[in-house]
Amino acid sequence: MAVPQNKITKSRRGQRRSHDALVAGNPNECPNCGELKRPHHVCAACGHYADREVIAQADEIDLDEDAA
């Protein structure tokens, strides 16, 4: 069974982990609606990408009307 030959110091462990930090995203403003969106992704608020509608937004459904 493999075991460590020597103890890894806190300093050495920290140096190894120094590159593991997550990088914060860089959101862009949607040119259509102004909401923040991820770069090179479809806007979640309006469904537009590169000045054209990619995902059609569904209208709100009134549940009371459909139940009758």
Curated annotation (Swiss-Prot):
GO MF entries: structural constituent of ribosome
A GO CC annotation given for this chain: large ribosomal subunit
Protein's recorded name: Large ribosomal subunit protein bL32
Keywords: Ribonucleoprotein, Ribosomal protein
Gene: rpmF
Disordered as annotated region, ranges: 1-25
InterPro entries the record matches: Ribosomal_bL32, Ribosomal_bL32_bact, Ribosomal_zn-bd
UniProt xrefs under HAMAP family: Ribosomal_bL32
GO biological process, alphabetically ordered: translation
Keyword Ribonucleoprotein: yes
Family: Belongs to the bacterial ribosomal protein bL32 family.
Species, as recorded: Dinoroseobacter shibae (strain DSM 16493 / NCIMB 14021 / DFL 12)
